Design a protein with these regions (language model features):
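Conserved active-site and cofactor/substrate-binding residues in soluble primary-metabolism enzymes
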Residues: 4-11, 27-30, 34, 48, ...
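Short, glycine/charged-enriched hinge/interface segments at domain edges or termini
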Residues: 2-4, 9, 62-233, 370, ...
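Short, hydrophobic/aliphatic alpha-helical segments
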Residues: 35-49, 90-102, 294-295, 299-301
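Intrinsically disordered, low-complexity, positively charged segments
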Residues: 5-70
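Helix-rich terminal scaffold detector
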Residues: 1-10, 176-305, 309-315
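Flexible glycine/proline-rich
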Residues: 10, 23, 28-33, 42, ...
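Solvent-exposed alpha-helices and their adjacent loops that cap or buttress functional pockets
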Residues: 54-56, 71-74, 92-96, 109-111, ...
């Protein structure tokens, strides 16, 4: 049963974001080949035109377009052939009226010409005469000087995540290095007397650490650096020391375990000990992920995550990812969620008063995408392995019906 006083995830997130200090993240300068998916820290203004000259988009002949007007296969035009444009060289000639110059794809348009006619529409008559079988208009088959980027134009704006094509544009205007925001550093602390490392033999009552490896992959995929602080016993002073150290060498602190009510619940108390404002919420109207703790200490977000793997992944998506966006330099800009539209293949129930995040697998059948619920408790890692994404059931709904269209947030 969910307490109606619990915050919805979006409202809980807003408490953390609003409590964080303002200011720009630190920056660094990188070669463009190392800047993929990094966040630009400054606007990039081109110091030159791209292209730096008018050039042909096809193999053909540079001409005065007017000399071809009316030309067709049954009534061709005839032009003298006197010059040839060479790749990588500026033409040292001018195309006079009534003449053409042979030009390759990418070749610089010679002075006097204003269009290029394709090879397929030209018939050689002799070494110095060609037959034009189709007319062209001024600018046909030509990329003009500065048509792609003009000198003084803002090519990329600060706060943008660099894609491969953006890096190509930088290279095209001669930019070889770029100022970007530094990757945020996230410390992760695993707590629990029952947690052991993956290479340890299991004794009765013990489980291997799953969450630190899952979160490390998620953090890396989202432009940050994860520092795993190891496994800390359920001891107040040990956990406090680990959090204190993490606040000194990282931008965000994540603690796994110690969030459910019980004798060994120390996370909230320790966060409050770290300084104002401390814990901002303890528990959210969410499944899985109800025991989530959110706070800010020493100007840095400190989050207590549920120990169940599925809950950890959901909480990363709802809380950690948006906060990382801010720390990465995206500020309050919305991030793009990879999603697909699908049709629910089966009914799925949900309790009233909470936001339910259902793991689903997606299959294509008869030309449409179907979303199949992946059933299982949030402590089962295989429910994530078998799933392709999440479908959100809003707090106001009691479930989803088979045949209902849904949005699947892809992992």
């Amino acid at each position: 049963m969910f307490d109606k006083n619990y915050l919805l995830p979006a409202d809980a997130l807003a408490l953390i974001v609003n409590a964080l200090p303002g200011g720009r993240p630190k920056t660094e300068k990188l070669p463009i080949e190392e800047s993929y998916r990094r966040i630009i820290a400054v606007d990039v203004v081109s110091l030159e035109d791209l292209p730096g000259f008018s050039r042909s988009t096809v193999d053909g002949y540079a001409v005065h377009a007017e000399d071809t007007f009316g030309a067709k296969e049954t009534s061709p035009a005839y032009l003298g052939l006197k010059y040839e444009v060479l790749m990588g060289q500026a033409p040292d000639f001018e195309v006079a009226r009534g003449f053409a110059a042979k030009i390759p794809t990418g070749g610089m348009l010679p002075p006097g010409s204003d269009a290029v006619i394709m090879l397929e529409h030209v018939q050689p008559v002799s070494e110095d005469l060609i037959e034009i079988l189709r007319a062209v208009a001024p600018g046909d088959n030509v990329i003009q000087l500065g048509e792609d980027i003009r000198k003084g134009e803002t090519v990329l704006t600060a706060g943008k995540s660099l894609r491969a094509q953006d890096i190509g544009a930088l290279a095209g205007i001669g930019v070889t290095s770029i100022e970007v925001f530094k990757k945020p550093v996230v410390s992760f602390i695993s707590t629990g007397d029952e947690i052991v490392s993956p290479d340890s033999p299991l004794r009765p009552g013990q489980v291997r650490d799953i969450n630190s490896f899952t979160l490390a992959g998620l953090a890396m995929n989202h432009g940050s650096i994860m520092i795993k602080k190891g496994i800390i016993r359920d001891n107040y002073e040990e956990i406090r020391k680990a959090i204190e150290e993490s606040l000194q060498d990282s931008d965000m602190v994540l603690i796994s375990g110690g969030t459910s009510a019980g004798l060994k619940d120390m996370t909230a108390a320790i966060i409050n000990d770290m300084g104002m404002p401390g814990v901002l919420f303890h528990g959210v109207s969410l499944k899985p992920g109800k025991p989530m703790i959110g706070g800010v200490a020493q100007g840095k977000p400190v989050l207590g995550l549920p120990g169940h793997p599925a809950a950890t992944v959901v909480c990363f998506d709802l809380f950690i990812k948006p906060i990382l966006n801010r720390l990465r330099g995206l500020g309050r800009q919305p991030y793009i969620i990879r999603s697909v539209k699908a049709t629910m293949a089966k009914n799925i129930a949900s309790a009233a008063g909470r936001e339910d995040h259902i793991r689903v697998s997606v299959e294509e059948k008869e030309g449409k995408l179907l979303a199949f619920p992946v059933l299982g408790k949030s402590g089962l890692i295989t429910t994530l392995v078998k799933a392709d994404g999440i479908v959100i059931i809003p707090q106001s709904k009691l479930g989803l019906d088979a045949g209902e269209e849904v949005t699947v947030r892809l992992f």
